[in-house]
Amino acid sequence: MSDERYQQRQQRVKEKVDARVAQAQDERGIIIVFTGNGKGKTTAAFGTATRAVGHGKKVGVVQFIKGTWPNGERNLLEPHGVEFQVMATGFTWDTQNRESDTAACREVWQHAKRMLADSSLDMVLLDELTYMVAYDYLPLEEVVQALNERPHQQTVIITGRGCHRDILCLLYTSPSP
């Protein structure tokens, strides 16, 4: 290949790369789901949220199926302005009271909806949300609607096993041209 042909080919590659970079500059939020049977979903989500806080972003956290015990993530992030809303009933398999679990979930969900509507929040972490949908504590349609109506720039992180496919369908993907 001649130097001239090589230079022309590389120029075309550069134009494609530049176009992709320009497209990626669109400031829009995404939905990230950490799901599956293994460990580390909440840890990965908090790592992402911590990084966002480190870059000056405003983050809100809603924890479903968590207890009242102190945790390191909250101890670290609350002093940096991260709002936490925690269901604080403990694990639902311990309480075994569907009515009170559903009521507690609905109460915390109201805070989650407020955060999802708040354009000042760059990121909202919905820890263990998948269980709330799977256990029918929250209507799937209401969750999908709140996710769809969130501010354009807001990123949402969802954790938990068995994420419903209708939530997974909201994930933004961009196939390569």
Question: For each of these PLM feature ranges, what is it?
Answer:
Residues 33-39, 43-113:
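Conserved P-loop
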Residues 120-122, 152-157:
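Loop/turn-to-beta-strand initiation segments
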Residues 14-17, 105-110, 156-159:
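Short gly/ser/thr-rich secondary-structure transition/capping motifs
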Residues 172-177:
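Conserved small/polar residues in nucleotide/adenosyl-binding loops
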Residues 160-164:
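Short, polar loop motifs at secondary-structure junctions
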Residues 1-29:
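Extreme N-terminal, non-catalytic leader segments
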Residues 80, 169-170:
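Short, structured coil segments at secondary-structure junctions
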Residues 97-148:
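Phosphate-binding/switch loop-helix module in NTP-utilizing enzymes
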